[in-house]
Design a protein with these regions (language model features):
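N-terminal binding-site loop/beta-alpha segment at the start of enzyme catalytic domains
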Residues: 1-83, 122
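Generic beta-strand or strand-like secondary-structure segments
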Residues: 68-72, 87, 107-114
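Conserved catalytic core of Hanks-type protein kinase domains
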Residues: 39, 87, 118
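Glycine/Thr-rich phosphate-binding loops of Rossmann-like dinucleotide-binding domains
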Residues: 26, 55-57, 94, 134-137
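Surface-exposed, interaction-prone regions with an acidic/low-complexity signature
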Residues: 85, 91-93, 99
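Active-site beta-loop-alpha junctions enriched in small/polar residues
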Residues: 21-23, 52, 87-91, 129-132
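Glycine/proline-rich, positively charged
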Residues: 95-172
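A short alpha-helix capping/helix-coil boundary motif
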Residues: 12-16, 91-95, 147
Length: 172
């Protein structure tokens, strides 16, 4: 397996990343366990998940993929062998955090804490915003006109306080 340095960190990630978005919906928990075991056997140490998974997203399966990974970590004690990436879901799912899913402090903090609990870990190696939260033309919307004065969307720079706090505390 080939490995690359992750950004400006000292983490070495496999050039193949294990995607997990179907676990709990299209794939069973035992199948997820089998894939995780096989990934480590072949040196795949970079794994990607998200609070939104499994896919297709539904309120009933929200966070389920993270739960599967967390149970596997608890069972195998292999958390230290994995470079784990997860994502906070942005706008679009009203069942997330009671519809409070914009990228602002309390929502980011609640999402991060939920992921940590489901994943049964005290740190996440790479924490990402799943969707941009900006007022842009998306999914084929016709006739979109950008308004420079539009202030209802958060700027990405405004989102870093809870994330920086988590980085300082070695949670992310």
């Amino acid at each position: 397996m080939n490995y690359q340095k992750l950004g400006n960190t000292n983490l070495k990630v496999s050039t193949i990343c294990l995607g997990t978005m179907t676990w709990g919906e299209q794939n069973s928990e035992p199948e997820g366990y089998e894939q995780m075991d096989l990934a480590l056997d072949y040196g795949v140490n970079f794994w990607d998940t998200a609070e939104l998974y499994s896919v297709p997203p539904r309120a009933e399966t929200f966070g389920y993929t993270e739960l599967i990974i967390g149970r596997w970590f608890k069972k195998t004690k292999n958390r230290d062998k994995v470079i784990l990436a997860t994502k906070v879901a942005g706008p679009a799912r009203d069942y997330l955090r009671n519809g409070q899913n914009s990228f602002v402090g309390k929502n980011l903090e609640e999402a991060l804490n939920g992921s940590l609990k489901r994943l049964k870990t005290d740190y996440i190696d790479l924490y990402q915003l799943h969707w941009p939260e900006r007022n842009v033309n998306s999914f084929g919307k016709l006739g979109y006109k950008h308004d420079e004065e539009e202030n209802e969307w958060n700027k990405i720079e405004d989102n870093d306080n809870p994330i920086n706090a988590a980085i300082t505390q070695n949670v992310v």
